[in-house]
C-alpha cells in the first residue's frame, strides 16, 4: 500500500473539460424523451400562476444573437419561477404575416400578380411554417424549455379568428374609421406603414429658400411683397396650398439694398437669412405678429391656378428655416392638421410607386419624386433665394431600407385619440423594468397619432369590412362575428376564395344595398395588429394561461412596437393593459459597440456559438451583461465568459469529488455541531441564496452572475476550499472534522446547482447526474432552496469579517517573508501573531485552528507589546514570520517537530501516525511501499 492511499483524495468521473457542444444536444434529447416540460407543469398544477407572454419573433431566417438574448432571458425567468413554486407555462409564438415573406418569394421569382391569389398565399403560408420549424430548432438548441409542440402562430385560423374579434370589438365602439390623412408611405413596398415600421437614418438633402408673391395683402402687405419660405422636400412644392406662420411670432417686412422687392421673414431668423441670401444691408419697413398675417393670399410660385393662403399654426418654430412653413396638406401630418382647419385642398402629387402624378404638372409627370429638385429649382426662377445641402434624420422603411414619404391616401385607422387618457392611466398602473420605460411609453402614447391599420398587400389577415352599393362601410358586430367564425373554421384564405355575399351572414341586408349587392375590402391588417391582439389569441384563450399577463419582455424598440400596439387594442376592448409589468432590454452590439451587419462581418450567430463554446456559455453571457442598456458580444468576450464558466465548473467539480463518499442521510452534521468556520460558510452561503432569490425576483441576472462568481472565487476557492482540503484529504474519512466540512460542501453543491439551473441547465443537469442521493431524476424537477438564518448570525459575520482583515494582513507578512527567501510556500512558515487584547479575544472567540485557516504549519500568539522592531506591524497587531521547525510530514505536507520515520515505513507527524494506526492496521502491519526518506 502506498502512503497516499491513506489520504481521502476526491474521486469523480465528472470531467474538467465540459464538452458542451457535444453534450448539450444529448441532454436536450433526454429532456424531450422524459417530457420534462410537461412534468414540470404537472408538478406545479394548482400553484400560484406566473405567466410570461412571448412576443412573437418574425418567422424568417435563422435566429440572431438578439433573439438569443431575448429567449434565454425569458427562459431564465420562467425556469426560476417554475422551480420556485409557480405554475409558469411558456408558450412560444411566431409572427408569420407581412411583407418580408412576400419579398422572399419575389426574390425566388414568384410573381404575385401573375398567379392565383389563393395559390400565392398558400406558398406564403408554407414558407412561414418552414421558418417557424427552423427557428424552433435554433431556440431548442439554446436549451429553452417551452411548449414547443403547441406554439402560437399568427397564421393559425384560431388566432386569426380571435384577431378579428378584437377588431370587431373596436369597430363596435367606433374606434375604427376611414380617412385620407397623410400616412407614412413606402413607395418601395407600395403600402402604408405604421410608426413601428419606421427607422431613421441621417441623409443629405437639398433645401430651398424661395418666395411667394403676395396677391391680396388684406391691407397689411402690398402686392410687391414676397413671403419667404423654406423646404427640405422640394417635390412637395407641387402640392403646396398654404403658408403657415406662428401666431405669436414676430415677422419683419424688409427691403434689401438694391432690390425693388420687399420680403417677409421671422425677426429671430433675419440675420442668419440675410447672410444666406447675400443681403449686405436692408431696410426694415414694418413689423407684424403672425396673427396679423392670417388669410393673406399669395401666388403659387409657378402654378397660376393655385393660391396659397397664409394660415396660423403652433408647430412653427425659429429652430430653422424662415419662420414660415410652406404647407402641403397631402404630404405631412402637421400640414394636414392645420390645413383642414382652413379647408385647404389636400393635393397628392405622388403615386403609390413614388412617381409624380399628372396633377403635379406636365414638367413633373412620371418623374421619381426625389429626382425632381432640379425641375423645382428651374420653375422657381428668380423666386429662389438660396439652396443648401443639409444633413438630417429621415424616416426609412425598416424592411426595404428605402426612404419613405408622408402621403395622404384613403386608409383605415384605429383611433387612439378617443381613449388616449385611458391608455395613459393604464401605463401608470404598470410596473416597468427599467423604471424609465414608463416615461418612454407614456410619451409615445401621449404624442402619437391614430394608428393606420390598413396595408395594400396580400399576405396578412384581411380587414373584415364590406361595402354597400352606396359605398357605406359595413363592420357591425353581427358581420365581424360571422367572419371570425368563418376564419376559425377555414382560415382567412376563405376571404379570397369567396364572394362578398358568401362571406356575409345568411340573409344579410343593408339599406345601402337595395339590390343586395356587396363588395369586400381588399386591404389587409397591419401585422402589428396581428401580434398586438395576441393577448386575446393566446393569453385570453389558451388553457392554463391568463390575461393580463404577468410580464412582457422584449427589446427596447418594442415601446413603439408590440408594447404599444398590444396596449392600444387591450385598453380599447377591455379597458386595461394586457400586462402587469414590462421588462425591456437594450440592443446587442459587437465587441466595439457597433451595430452588427453582414457588410461589417461582425455578426455573431447563436448557432456558431453553440458549436464552438456551447449554449451554456451564451446563456452565462446573457446573465453577465446589463440588459437595461445596449450590450456587447464578440467571440473574444464569449471566450472570457468561458473562462469564468471554467472556474465555476471546476470549483463545483471539487465539491462533487470531495463528497463522493458522503451520504447526506447518515453523514450530515447538524448546524449546532459544525465547526466555527463551517458555520460561517453556511451563513455566507445562505446570504448568497437570499441574494440570488431576490435577484431572480427582480429579473436582475447580472446580480446573480456577480454574486455567484464572487462566492465561487473569493469565498470558496480563495478561502474555504483553500484550507478545507487539508481537512478533507488528511483527517480520517469518517471523522467529525471531515464530515462537518463535507456537510457544508454538499449543502452548497446541491443548492447552488439548483440556483444555477435557470442559467446553466445543461451543466447543472450533468452535475445532478452525479448526485446519487437526490431523489429527483432531473434537477429541473427540483425546487429552489430557501435561504435560512441562524442564531447570532450578525455577531458571527462581524467576527469573521474582522478575521478576514487579519488574514489579509498575515498574507502580506507571509509575502514579505517569501520575497526575503525566509520561506517558500506558506506551509513552511512559523507565524507569530503579536496581538492586542482585542485581537486575542477575537481569535479565542473564533474557536478555530488559526494555523489551518492561515495555511501555516506553526502558529504562536503573543502580546503586542513583545513585538520585535522588524515585525510587520498594523494597527493593534504585528506579525513575525520564521521558518517552521521540524520536518515535512509526507502525508500532511506540514512541517512538524514530531515528524519522523515510523516502523511501518512512513515519514509522518504524530497526528498522521495516529490516523494511520487507527484506520489502516493492515498497512501498519505490512509496512508501506518505499518512502522518499
UniProtKB/Swiss-Prot annotation:
Pfam families with a match to the protein in the record: Anticodon_1, tRNA-synt_1
PROSITE patterns linked to this entry: AA_TRNA_LIGASE_I
SUPFAM superfamilies documented for this protein: Anticodon-binding domain of a subclass of class I aminoacyl-tRNA synthetases, Nucleotidylyl transferase, ValRS/IleRS/LeuRS editing domain
EC class name: ligase
InterPro entries with a match to the protein in the record: aa-tRNA-synth_I_CS, aa-tRNA-synth_Ia, Anticodon_Ile_BEm, Ile-tRNA-ligase, Ile-tRNA-ligase_type1, Ile-tRNA_ligase, M/V/L/I-tRNA-synth_anticd-bd, Rossmann-like_a/b/a_fold
Oligomer status and interactors: Monomer.
Protein name: Isoleucine--tRNA ligase
Organism lineage: Bacteria, Bacillati, Bacillota, Bacilli, Lactobacillales
Gene: ileS
Amino acid at each position: 500500500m502506498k502512503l497516499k492511499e491513506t489520504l481521502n483524495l476526491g474521486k469523480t468521473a465528472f470531467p474538467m473539460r465540459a464538452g458542451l457542444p457535444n453534450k448539450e444536444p444529448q441532454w436536450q434529447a433526454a429532456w424531450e424523451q422524459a417530457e420534462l416540460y410537461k412534468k414540470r407543469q404537472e408538478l406545479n398544477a394548482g400553484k400560484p400562476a406566473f405567466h410570461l407572454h412571448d412576443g412573437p419573433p418574425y418567422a424568417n431566417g435563422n435566429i440572431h444573437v438578439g433573439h438569443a438574448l431575448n429567449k434565454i432571458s425569458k427562459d431564465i425567468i420562467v425556469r426560476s419561477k417554475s422551480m420556485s413554486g409557480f405554475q409558469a407555462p411558456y408558450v412560444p409564438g411566431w409572427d408569420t404575416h407581412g411583407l418580408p415573406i412576400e419579398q422572399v418569394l419575389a426574390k425566388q421569382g414568384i410573381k404575385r400578380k401573375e398567379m392565383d391569389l389563393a395559390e400565392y398565399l398558400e406558398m406564403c403560408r408554407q414558407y412561414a411554417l418552414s421558418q417557424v420549424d427552423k427557428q424552433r430548432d435554433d431556440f431548442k438548441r439554446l436549451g429553452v424549455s417551452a411548449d414547443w409542440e403547441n406554439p402560437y402562430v399568427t397564421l393559425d385560423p384560431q388566432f386569426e379568428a380571435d384577431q378579428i374579434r378584437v377588431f370587431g370589438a373596436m369597430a363596435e365602439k367606433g374606434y375604427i374609421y376611414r380617412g385620407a390623412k397623410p400616412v407614412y408611405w413606402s413607395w418601395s413596398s407600395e403600402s402604408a406603414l405604421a410608426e413601428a415600421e419606421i427607422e431613421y437614418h441621417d441623409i443629405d438633402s437639398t433645401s430651398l429658400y424661395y418666395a411667394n408673391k403676395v396677391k391680396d395683402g388684406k391691407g397689411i402687405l402690398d402686392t410687391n411683397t414676397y413671403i419667404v419660405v423654406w423646404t427640405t422636400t422640394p417635390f412637395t412644392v407641387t402640392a403646396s396650398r398654404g403658408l403657415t406662420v406662428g401666431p405669436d411670432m414676430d415677422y419683419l417686412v424688409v427691403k434689401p439694398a438694391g432690390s425693388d422687392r420687399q420680403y417677409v421673414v421671422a425677426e429671430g431668423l433675419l440675420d442668419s437669412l440675410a447672410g444666406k441670401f447675400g443681403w449686405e444691408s436692408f431696410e426694415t419697413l414694418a413689423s407684424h405678429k403672425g396673427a396679423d398675417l392670417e388669410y393673406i393670399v399669395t401666388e403659387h410660385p409657378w402654378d397660376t391656378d393655385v393660391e396659397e393662403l397664409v394660415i396660423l399654426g403652433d408647430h412653427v418654430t425659429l429652430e430653422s428655416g424662415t419662420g414660415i412653413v410652406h404647407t402641403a396638406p397631402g404630404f405631412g401630418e402637421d400640414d394636414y392638421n392645420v390645413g383642414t382647419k382652413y379647408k385647404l385642398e389636400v393635393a397628392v402629387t405622388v403615386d403609390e410607386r413614388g412617381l409624380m402624378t399628372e396633377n403635379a404638372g406636365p414638367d413633373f409627370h412620371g418623374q421619381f419624386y426625389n429626382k425632381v429638385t432640379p425641375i423645382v429649382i428651374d420653375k422657381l426662377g428668380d423666386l429662389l433665394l438660396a439652396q443648401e445641402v443639409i444633413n438630417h434624420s429621415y424616416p426609412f422603411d425598416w424592411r426595404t431600407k428605402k426612404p419613405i414619404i408622408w402621403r395622404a391616401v384613403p386608409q383605415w385607422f384605429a383611433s387612439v385619440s378617443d381613449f388616449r387618457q385611458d391608455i395613459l392611466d393604464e401605463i401608470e398602473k404598470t410596473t416597468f423594468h427599467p423604471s424609465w420605460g414608463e416615461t418612454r411609453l407614456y410619451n409615445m402614447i401621449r404624442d402619437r397619432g391614430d394608428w393606420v391599420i390598413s396595408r395594400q398587400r396580400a399576405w396578412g389577415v384581411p380587414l373584415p369590412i364590406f361595402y354597400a352599393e352606396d359605398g357605406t362601410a359595413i363592420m357591425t358586430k353581427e358581420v365581424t362575428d360571422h367572419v371570425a367564425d368563418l376564419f376559425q373554421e377555414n382560415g382567412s384564405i376563405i376571404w379570397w376564395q369567396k364572394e362578398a355575399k358568401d362571406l356575409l351572414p345568411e340573409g344579410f341586408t343593408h339599406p345601402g344595398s337595395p339590390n343586395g349587392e356587396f363588395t369586400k375590402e381588399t386591404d389587409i391588417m397591419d401585422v402589428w395588429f396581428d401580434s398586438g391582439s395576441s393577448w386575446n389569441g393566446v393569453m385570453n384563450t389558451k388553457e392554463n394561461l391568463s390575461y393580463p399577463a404577468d410580464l412582457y419582455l422584449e427589446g427596447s424598440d418594442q415601446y413603439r412596437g408590440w408594447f404599444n400596439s398590444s396596449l392600444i387594442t387591450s385598453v380599447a376592448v377591455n379597458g386595461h393593459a394586457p400586462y402587469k409589468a414590462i421588462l425591456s432590454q437594450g440592443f446587442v452590439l459587437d465587441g466595439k459597440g457597433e451595430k452588427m451587419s453582414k457588410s461589417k462581418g461582425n455578426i455573431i450567430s447563436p448557432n456558431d456559438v453553440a458549436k464552438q463554446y456551447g449554449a451554456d456559455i451564451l446563456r452565462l453571457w446573457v446573465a453577465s451583461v446589463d440588459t437595461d442598456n445596449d450590450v456587447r458580444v464578440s467571440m473574444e468576450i464569449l471566450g472570457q465568459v468561458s473562462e469564468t464558466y471554467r472556474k465555476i465548473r471546476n470549483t463545483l467539480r471539487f465539491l462533487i469529488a470531495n463528497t463522493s463518499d458522503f451520504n447526506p442521510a447518515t453523514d450530515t452534521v447538524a448546524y449546532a455541531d459544525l465547526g466555527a468556520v463551517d458555520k460561517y460558510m453556511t451563513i455566507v452561503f445562505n446570504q448568497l441564496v437570499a441574494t440570488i432569490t431576490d435577484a431572480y425576483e427582480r429579473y436582475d441576472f447580472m446580480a446573480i452572475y456577480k454574486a455567484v462568481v464572487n462566492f465561487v472565487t473569493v469565498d470558496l476557492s480563495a478561502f474555504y476550499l483553500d484550507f478545507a482540503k487539508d481537512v478533507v484529504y488528511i483527517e480520517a474519512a469518517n471523522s467529525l472534522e471531515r464530515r462537518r466540512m463535507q456537510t457544508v460542501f454538499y449543502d452548497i453543491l446541491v443548492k447552488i446547482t439548483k440556483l444555477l439551473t435557470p442559467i446553466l441547465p445543461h451543466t447543472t443537469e450533468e452535475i445532478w447526474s452525479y448526485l446519487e442521493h437526490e431523489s429527483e431524476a432531473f434537477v429541473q424537477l427540483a425546487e429552489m432552496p430557501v435561504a435560512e438564518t441562524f442564531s447570532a448570525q450578525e455577531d458571527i459575520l462581524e467576527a469573521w469579517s474582522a478575521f478576514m482583515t487579519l488574514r489579509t494582513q498575515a498574507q502580506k507578512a507571509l509575502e514579505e517573508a517569501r520575497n526575503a527567501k525566509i520561506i517558500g510556500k506558506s506551509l513552511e512558515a512559523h507565524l507569530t501573531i503579536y496581538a492586542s487584547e482585542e485581537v486575542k479575544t477575537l481569535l479565542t472567540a473564533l474557536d478555530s485552528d488559526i494555523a489551518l485557516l492561515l495555511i501555516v504549519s506553526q502558529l504562536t500568539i503573543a502580546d503586542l507589546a513583545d513585538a520585535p522592531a522588524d515585525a510587520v506591524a498594523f494597527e493593534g497587531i504585528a506579525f513575525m514570520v520564521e521558518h517552521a521547525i521540524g520536518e515535512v510530514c509526507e502525508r500532511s505536507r506540514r512541517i512538524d517537530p514530531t515528524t519522523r520515520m515510523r516502523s511501518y515505513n512512513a515519514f509522518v507527524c504524530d497526528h498522521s501516525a495516529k490516523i494511520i494506526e487507527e484506520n489502516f492496521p493492515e498497512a501498519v502491519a505490512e509496512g508501506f511501499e518505499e518512502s522518499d526518506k
